[in-house]
Amino acid sequence: MVQASGHRRSTRGSKMVSWSVIAKIQEILQRKMVREFLAEFMSTYVMMVFGLGSVAHMVLNKKYGSYLGVNLGFGFGVTMGVHVAGRISGAHMNAAVTFANCALGRVPWRKFPVYVLGQFLGSFLAAATIYSLFYTAILHFSGGQLMVTGPVATAGIFATYLPDHMTLWRGFLNEAWLTGMLQLCLFAITDQENNPALPGTEALVIGILVVIIGVSLGMNTGYAINPSRDLPPRIFTFIAGWGKQVFSNGENWWWVPVVAPLLGAYLGGIIYLVFIGSTIPREPLKLEDSVAYEDHGITVLPKMGSHEPTISPLTPVSVSPANRSSVHPAPPLHESMALEHF
């Protein structure tokens, strides 16, 4: 009897400890920054699994894959990623887009390392997943050798490499320009004062944008246009056995898909804001209490799932002190997705 009673008390105690641990984990996961980190991690993982899987089909068996299939895989992978995380982090899935939004004041800099870390880990895990799923097919195709160049090269499944007809600096300009086009169009798609995508279609339209870039302009460099898409899988291939040639190939090409997209996204965002955003007539925002405007995080350009104070320098704000005491602050706007972040 004594033993049975002690056993029951021990069981109840272990259950209480278990529930306490679960509650603590849930509390941590509900923190905004943690949720945004996990959102970037999962959305990037989803995008990269579909994208890299489509490349594996094209490289390993032409019967099942094609260049069009690669573009569709990455494009609709982006669409699925936006659905996974659009209402939590904005589903950037791209360190260059995160950098541009931070540099242009749309996202606080403190979120930059959190978002990029989530993206890099998701991309790395996606590369490991594709390697595991296609391991036997890779070895069969290459005769058991993990090659970076040559007719049985398989490193290109995971990262982009400079083709023979391109020079390093032409490739740099190509990557910067394509990423600039991406960012410019993303701002257009989500600009509520211009001609944005219809509510609920943003994810699909952004996926189509990626497909268009690929089928029209992707031949020269494989259109990485995303440090989070290229560098983590490249690091994985180095660890998995492809060797240091994954970094040295193409005149040390590896750094170009990291640096060029950052520059391109920033310039593309500036070009849109200066030449398009600043020329659109915008009605003054009717906020009577400027203090409430600053304190409650009211954003002129509506964005989903984020209450960070984001005031566009291009939007005039009309403030009247006449009725400060009688006016209640307006709530944050949520009519559109936060995909200006993408």
UniProtKB/Swiss-Prot annotation:
The record marks 135 as: Important for permeability to glycerol. Glycerol transport is regulated by pH, with the porin being permeable to glycerol at pH 7.4 but not at pH 5.5. Water permeability, however, is not influenced by pH. Inhibited by mercury ions. The keyword Cell membrane applies. InterPro entries: Aquaporin-like (IPR023271), MIP (IPR000425), MIP/Aquaporin (IPR050363). Keywords: Cell membrane, Cytoplasmic vesicle, Lipid droplet, Membrane, Phosphoprotein, Repeat, Transmembrane, Transmembrane helix, Transport. Residues 1-36, 86-89, 104-111, 189-200, 276-342 are cytoplasmic. It is a multi-pass membrane protein. Changing residue 264 to V: Loss of glycerol channel activity; loss of water channel activity. Signal peptide: none annotated. Gene3D superfamilies: Glycerol uptake facilitator protein. Detected in the sperm head (at protein level). Detected in white adipose tissue. The modification Phosphoserine is found at residue 20. The chain crosses the membrane at residues 37-54, 68-85, 112-132, 171-188, 201-217, 254-275. One of its GO terms (biological process) is water transport. It is found in: Cell membrane; Cytoplasmic vesicle membrane; Lipid droplet. Pfam families: MIP (PF00230). The keyword Transport applies. Phosphorylation by PKA could prevent the interaction with PLIN1. Its main location: membrane. Aquaglyceroporins form homotetrameric transmembrane channels, with each monomer independently mediating glycerol and water transport across the plasma membrane along their osmotic gradient. Could also be permeable to urea. Mediates the efflux of glycerol, formed upon triglyceride hydrolysis, to avoid its accumulation in adipocytes and to make it available to other tissues. In the kidney, mediates the reabsorption of glycerol, preventing its loss in urine, again participating to energy homeostasis. This is Aquaporin-7. The gene is AQP7.
